[in-house]
Amino acid sequence: MGVTRIGLLGGSFDPVHVAHIALADTARQFLGLDQVQLIPAANPWQRQPLKASAPHRLRMLELAIAGHPALAINPVEIERGGATYTADTVRALPGGPQYFWLLGTDQLQNFCTWRDWQDIAARIELAVATRPGASIAPPAELAAWLAAHRRQLHELPFAPMAVSASDIRQRLAAGAATDGLLPEPVAAYIATHHLYR
């Protein structure tokens, strides 16, 4: 039996939406992952304060991944609390599996601003979601580091989806429709608990 391959998708998931689930499923299939763990942030240091509480975001994730047996929630950052740094999360991963951190092209461009980014890149593989047919151009500092350490970026063809959590929050606050943007159980949960109003 080979090494277990695990994808890691960090985010605020405020709220989790269809593009998050589609990216996780695509990564699992394209990279041959045994599991994709969604890692909700406690307090992401480069983002605005979160709107929904950790228990609400965890419950929405549970609802979103129901029916996706290869997707799981890793609550390590919420359990740790405080400022959320990917480097701390990566250092806490148990040994054995091969890990792939899933990034968007926007995250790739600011990756070298992350705390201890070299340590992250040394410990896990980086997989970047790109438009099908497009190539990725990492920042020069990251490209040089990868070349010096004989590492590569894994490209993950993923058609962009016009979905963002901030747009969904604005729509919900305005009472506008979010049809097709949220998994149905998540939309029902948000309505029941009057979130993002």
UniProtKB/Swiss-Prot annotation:
It holds the Pfam family CTP_transf_like. InterPro entries: Cyt_trans-like, NadD/NMNAT, Rossmann-like_a/b/a_fold. Belongs to the NadD family. It comes from Bordetella pertussis (strain Tohama I / ATCC BAA-589 / NCTC 13251). Pathway: Cofactor biosynthesis; NAD(+) biosynthesis; deamido-NAD(+) from nicotinate D-ribonucleotide: step 1/1. GO terms for biological process: NAD biosynthetic process. Catalyzes the reversible adenylation of nicotinate mononucleotide (NaMN) to nicotinic acid adenine dinucleotide (NaAD). Keywords: ATP-binding, NAD, Nucleotide-binding, Nucleotidyltransferase, Pyridine nucleotide biosynthesis, Transferase. This is Probable nicotinate-nucleotide adenylyltransferase. Disulfide bonds: none annotated. It catalyses: nicotinate beta-D-ribonucleotide + ATP + H(+) = deamido-NAD(+) + diphosphate. One of its GO terms (molecular function) is nicotinate-nucleotide adenylyltransferase activity. Its EC number is 2.7.7.18. It is an enzyme of class 2 (transferase). CDD domains: NMNAT.
